[in-house]
Amino acid sequence: MLMTTTTIAMSLSHDVIIAAAQRAARAIPPLWPLASSVAVNPFLGQASEPLEVAAARLRRASGIAVTMPRSWYAERLQSGEITEDDLQAAFQTAPAARRPPNVSALKHAIKVARPAPQAIPTVAELARDVTAIDWPGIVNERIGHWAAGYFDQGQALWAVGQSGGAYSTWRIIATHDLTPEIAGLAGFSQSVSDAPATAEDALVDCVARLGLSPDALDGYFHRLLTTLGGWGQVARYRLWQAELNGGTDACVTDLLAIRMLWEAALLHNGGSALVPGWQSAIAAYAAPVAASSDDVVDSILQEAAERAAQRKLNTVLAAPSSARLSRGRLTLQMAFCIDVRSEVFRRALESLDSGITTLGFAGFFGFGIGHRRFASDVVEARLPVLLSPGVVTCAGEPTPAANAAELSARITARAKRAWGRFKLAAISSFAFVEATGPIYIAKLLRDGLALARHHAPTDPAPRPAHELDLDTRLTMAARILKAMSFTSNFARLVVLAGHGAKVVNNPHASALHCGACGGYSGEVNAQLLASLLNDHQVRAGLAERGIVIPADTLFLAALHDTTTDAVTLFADDHPSPTHAQDLAQVTQWLAAAGALARGERALRLPRANRSQDIAHRARDWAEIRPEWALAGCQAFIAAPRSRSAGRDLAGRAFLHDYDWRCDHGFGVLELILTAPVVVASWISLQYYGSTVAPERFGAGNKLLHNVTGGIGVVEGNGGILRTGLPWQSVHDGERLIHEPLRLSVLIEAPTEAIGAILERHPQLRALFDNRWLHLFALDDEGRMARRYIGDLSWETYVGDASSQSNRASTLA
C-alpha cells in the first residue's frame, strides 16, 4: 500500500523545495579531480556551527562521530599530555547549560564510551531491513556505475554524453537498466520513464510522493547527498567552479533528484511494511538539530587536547633561539612555501651558516595564473582554489625553433595517446599482451625494481601569454614584495623555491604538490616572479617606490622536492657569470640541508632506516607512504622569521613572514587572514576529518584503490567514490601519525587590527568564533600573548591554564 501524501507535502511550493535542495548542496564539500586535487575542508558546510552542533548534524546525515574515541583522550590525560588545567580550561569554554555539572563529572564521562552514532534511515535502508536485500548497496552501485562514465575526464574510451545534463542522461540509461528489477524493484525503469522531464520537477514530485514535511527537507536532502559519497562532491565542485566564474550549475540538484527517484520507487514497492519506519524517519528529519550531552563532552575533550598542544607550542616559542645572526649582508635569502614540510628544510638550511635566512610565503608567490604547459592546450589554474586566474601564461618564447619543438612534442604526444588507446580498445586489448609483452620487459624490470630516475621539469621558462605593460609589472612586483614583508636588505642571491613531489604509482600525487598552486608543483610561479624581479625596468620603478634592490642581487627560481628534499635550481633562466661562486656555494648548502632534512624525516617514516632510503621510496611502485605530506600540521604562524628561527617546530607549522610595522593599513594582514589562513584551515581540517571519520571523510585503503574516470578512486570494483586522504596518509600501520587537532593561528599584529578584519569578513570570523580555528596574537617577542575567545573578544594568554584568575577579556 502506498503512503498517503500529506496535505502539508502537497502544499509545499516549488521554490521552497528547490531552496532546500540548494542549501543541502552547500552542506557538502566539493571534490577536485585527481589531476589537480587540493585539500578541502570536509566541514565546509558546517563552519557556521560549533563543533558539538556539527557533530549532531553529521551524525544524523552520515552516521559518524567528528571527534576521536574517548579512550584516545583518556590515554592522554593519564599520561599527563593533557593536564588537569587543560581539562578545566576547556570545561570553562563550553556552554554552561549543556556541559556536565563539574569537571569530576566530565572525568567520569571520559571513562564511558559514547553511543555509536546512527544516521537517520533512508527509504533504501528501511527497505533493506524489511526485505533483507541490500538496497543501499544496489543504489550506490548503479548510480556509481553511471556516474563514473558521466563525469569521466578522459580515462574511458567510450564516454557518456553530457548533453541535457546529468538527470536527463541518467534517465536515458536507467530506463534500459534492468538491474533494479532483477534485484526485486518491480517497474523501476517504467517509473523513471514516467518521471518528470526536469530534475526540479522530479524533486517536487518525489517530495509529495514521500510525504515530506517542510522541516524535514533540509535534513533529508543532506542525508541523501551524503549517501552518494564523492559523486555528490564532484557535482558540488562543478557548482563551485561555475560560481567562481559568475555562473551556476544544476548537477547537485540533478543527482539529488536521481537519488530521490530511487527512494520514491522503493517506498512504492515496499508498501505498508515501510510506512511506520518511514513516518518515524520523517519526524526525525524534521526535528531541530541539537547537540546532545555526549556531543558537548566530546567537544570539551577535543578542546582540552588542543590546549595541551598550544601550551607546548608556547613553550617552544618562548625558549631561547639557537639561530645565529649575521652581522653583515646576507649571502643567501631563500623563500619557501608556507607548507609545513618546508619548516624542516628551512631549519636545516639556516643551521649551516649565519649568512643564510629563509622566508615563508604562499607557494604561488602572488602569481594567480592560468598556465599552459609546453605543447599543451590545457590551462592549469596554478593558484589557490578560492581565486580565479588573473594572468594567462605559457612555456617558451614564440621563436621558429620553439614552434618546431612544440609541433614535434605534440606529434609525439598524439602517438602515445593513440598507442595507449590501442592497448585499451575493446578488440585489440585481448591480443596486446601476447603480441607486444616482451618489449615491455626492460621497462617492467626498471620500474618494478625502482631503478628509474626522476628528472627535473624540462619545459622552457614560462612567460605571460600576452605581454604585460610596465605599470602592470611594477604594480605586481611591489604588491608581492610587500605581501612577503620583503622590501629591504636583499642578499646577493635570492632563491624563490616552489615545491612539488615526485612519486610513482600514486593516484593522489597531485595532493602532495602545492595546495596554493591548485594541486600543481610551484616552479612555474617561482620562475615568473624571478623573471619579474630581475627586470631592470621593474627594479628602477620599484626604487622610485622606496624598494631598492641592489644591482648585484640575482633572483633565481627553484623546485623543492618534498619527497626527497632535493632542490633543483633554475640557474639557466638567468645566466650570471658574476654569481658563479655564489651558486657553487649555495648548491653545496642545499645538498647538505637536504641530507639533514632527509635524516629527520627518516625518523618518522616506516622502513626508512637511513636518509638514503628516502630517494628509493619515491621511485618504488609498491611504496604506499613515500612521504607524510602535511600530516601533523598544528599551527600557522604569521610573524617575522626571527620569532621562529632556530626553534624546532618538527614540521608541524605553516610559517608565513609578516611584519605588521611595515603593513600600513593592514592590507597584507587582511590578505593573509582571508587567503593563506583559509587554505591552511582546509588542509588541517581535511587531515582532521580523514583521521576522526575515515569511513566518511577518508579515501580508504590505498591497496584497494581503482582510479575512476580520472576523477577519484573507488575501493575495489566500484560504487561510492572515496574522498579525503587514504588511511595510509595518516596512519603508519601501528599508530596515528596525524594528531587530529584544529589549527592554531598565531599572528604578530595588534588585536584591534585583527578584530577589524574579522568584522569585515563574517565567514572568516565564523571559523574562529565556532572554534574551527584557534586564534592568538603574539607580542613583540613572538610569544603567545592574547587568545581570541569569540565575538571579537580576547583574553590574556598566560601559557598555563592554571592561572585562570588572570583572565582579562577586552573588546578589540
UniProtKB/Swiss-Prot annotation:
Residues binding Zn(2+), per UniProt: 337, 339, 499, 514
The regions listed as transmembrane in this protein's record are: none
Listed GO MF terms: zinc ion binding
Q: What is its main location?
A: membrane
Keyword Cytoplasm: yes or no?
Answer: no
Required co-factor(s) are:
Zn(2+)
What InterPro entries would the database entry show? DabA
Family the UniProt entry places it in: Belongs to the inorganic carbon transporter (TC 9.A.2) DabA family.
* Role description: Part of an energy-coupled inorganic carbon pump.
Q: Which HAMAP family match?
A: DabA (MF_01871)
Q: What is this protein called?
A: Probable inorganic carbon transporter subunit DabA
Organism in which the protein naturally occurs: Xanthomonas oryzae pv. oryzae (strain KACC10331 / KXO85)
Gene name per UniProt = dabA
